Amino acid sequence: MGNSKTNGFFTPEKYLYGIIQGLPPTLRGLAFIFFFLVAFYFFPAFWDLCGVLRGARGKGFPKRKSDANSQHSKQFWTHSDFPIWFLRVLIPTRASINSMKYPHTAALVR
């Protein structure tokens, strides 16, 4: 019987989308930020797919041969890269939160 949103089929994406859309705007923004924080720490491949890891140098973060096999080389967060991450993630996140709060302005931003 489902409504027009789900078209009668249940999928986890539609379920999560419904939950997020049902939140007040501030909580919706926090959920959005939380998603990106989780993606930061647990899914480096997610960022690879998104192309975010092509860093300021244009070809991703350099890998040193000395620590190529160490655990640290598998982690991509370093404090020196923080300004890049701030510019690339938090500011676009702010814009998307605003477009969620005020949907009629989203077309103006693009």
From Swiss-Prot:
One of its GO terms (cellular component) is membrane. It is found in: Membrane. The chain crosses the membrane at residues 29-49. Keywords: Membrane, Transmembrane, Transmembrane helix. It is a single-pass membrane protein. It comes from the Eukaryota. This is Uncharacterized protein YLR111W.
